[in-house]
Regions:
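N-terminal Rossmann-like FAD-binding beta1-loop-alpha1 element of flavoenzymes
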Residues: 4-31
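Conserved beta-strand segments of alpha/beta enzyme cores
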Residues: 28, 51, 76, 207-209
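Active-site/ligand-binding neighborhood in enzyme catalytic cores
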Residues: 89-93, 100-220
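Dinucleotide-binding Rossmann-like beta1-alpha1 core, especially the glycine-rich loop
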Residues: 48-123
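Glycine-rich FAD pyrophosphate-binding loop
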Residues: 23-48
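Short amphipathic alpha-helical segments and helix-helix/interface helices
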Residues: 19, 68, 199-203
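Short glycine-/acidic-enriched loop or helix-start segments at secondary-structure transitions
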Residues: 18-19, 41-42, 219-220
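Core beta-strand elements of the Rossmann-like FAD/NAD(P) dinucleotide-binding domain
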Residues: 2-4, 217-223
Length: 223
């Protein structure tokens, strides 16, 4: 007779939710985690009294009221709204690209004005884009590329945009509204006190073993 009903590899959000739901149905779960902590990439650390997302940042967002109610039953969420600001040599721009960005960049106030400006600048590249730089310009024009795409992308990839393939950027989000909210989902926030409160609650009914890796072999495949 097996000691456990389920062996769950990984204690991140997926594994923790599965363990929680299975435990509620009377199933015995063993969760193994190769790291020295639970929570996967949403794990948080307390540093000088500040909750830090070790692998983050992670902003929870969903368009499902059912999912939102589920996580709020586990832990209270704050009302944080993700509205990033990009700093280009002391010039501050709202992200993702929206009418506040375009107003700061060009002084335009209507969507039609912004669309015309982008359309004019997109013509700087003709034909099929051969690299990421050309692809980005074809999508959003030269000004947005030079100030808000080029530096970030080159830092991310460690290479010049001209040396990166065009397919890396399929699309760039552009909004012609005065909305600085990064996400379109109606529900978003960060759990008060960090994500550890959620994963601790989810894993409460399961046995958890840390620093245990798992490799599928012929011997354990039929577990």
């Amino acid at each position: 007779m097996r000691e456990y009903d389920y062996l769950i590899v990984g204690s991140g959000l997926f594994g923790a939710v599965f363990a929680h739901e299975a435990s509620k149905k009377g199933k015995k779960c063993l969760v193994i985690e190769k790291r020295d902590h639970t929570g996967g990439n949403i794990y948080c650390e307390e540093i000088n009294g500040i909750t830090v997302h070790k692998y983050g940042a992670h902003i929870f967002h969903t368009n499902s009221r059912r999912v939102w109610n589920y996580v709020n039953d586990l832990c209270e969420f704050n009302r944080y709204t993700n509205s990033p600001i990009a700093n280009y040599h002391g010039e501050l721009y709202n992200m993702p690209f929206n009418m506040n960005t375009f107003n700061k960049l060009w002084g335009v106030v209507t969507p039609a004005e912004a669309q015309r400006k982008i359309a004019e600048q997109r013509t700087a590249v003709s034909g099929e884009p051969s690299n990421l730089e050309e692809q980005a310009i074809r999508l959003v024009g030269t000004d947005l590329y030079e100030k808000l795409v080029k530096g970030y992308t080159e830092k991310q990839w460690g290479r010049d945009c001209k040396d990166l393939p065009a397919f890396i950027i399929k699309r760039l989000p552009v909004r012609f509204t005065y909305d600085n909210n990064y996400f379109n989902d109606p529900f978003q926030g960060i759990p008060e006190g960090g994500y550890n409160r959620i994963t601790d609650e989810l894993l409460d009914g399961a046995e958890v073993r840390l620093r245990v890796d798992f490799n599928v072999t012929p011997e354990n495949r039929a577990y």
